[in-house]
């Protein structure tokens, strides 16, 4: 098992049971999935750049990324149905814990002037969203092989009922939140 999965079972789960006075062990908040997504934006027309972005996300996640296509045509955005609009990868189980461990212990400490993740990324249902401005903080990414730098959105879905439980869960995992508000 992964380091964070062991940490969850040995120390985080009992701490959450104690703090939130949970009687049923199946109701303890846990990680459900992590979704990494990138909007293609202006690069959607260039197939080479789009494939390079997908390969980069696949390297970071350790799982093949999927190019997502538009479901409907939107004239205002100059998008046609079936047009590539982004890239995503969904991580569950062991790969999810491995990615979170890499994010917390390697990638985020390499961000220049990092002050912590914003606390306002919770959606009210126990899920947390945040964005990273570039992909170069991950050790798998080689600067020479990148055609364009791009950011990414990371969504951490939990089984928590509310933001307070989700915040405590992610804080116990070691996600560095910004001090203050």
Swiss-Prot record:
SUPFAM superfamilies: RL5-like. InterPro entries: Ribosomal_uL5 (IPR002132), Ribosomal_uL5_bac-type (IPR020930), Ribosomal_uL5_C (IPR031309), Ribosomal_uL5_CS (IPR020929), Ribosomal_uL5_dom_sf (IPR022803), Ribosomal_uL5_N (IPR031310). Disulfide bonds: none annotated. GO terms for biological process: translation. GO terms for molecular function: rRNA binding; structural constituent of ribosome; tRNA binding. It holds the Pfam family Ribosomal_L5. Gene3D superfamilies: 3.30.1440.10. Keywords: Ribonucleoprotein, Ribosomal protein, RNA-binding, rRNA-binding, tRNA-binding. One of its GO terms (cellular component) is ribosome. This is one of the proteins that bind and probably mediate the attachment of the 5S RNA into the large ribosomal subunit, where it forms part of the central protuberance. In the 70S ribosome it contacts protein S13 of the 30S subunit (bridge B1b), connecting the 2 subunits; this bridge is implicated in subunit movement. Contacts the P site tRNA; the 5S rRNA and some of its associated proteins might help stabilize positioning of ribosome-bound tRNAs. PANTHER family: 60S RIBOSOMAL PROTEIN L11-RELATED. Belongs to the universal ribosomal protein uL5 family. Part of the 50S ribosomal subunit; part of the 5S rRNA/L5/L18/L25 subcomplex. Contacts the 5S rRNA and the P site tRNA. Forms a bridge to the 30S subunit in the 70S ribosome. This is Large ribosomal subunit protein uL5. It comes from Campylobacter curvus (strain 525.92). The gene is rplE.
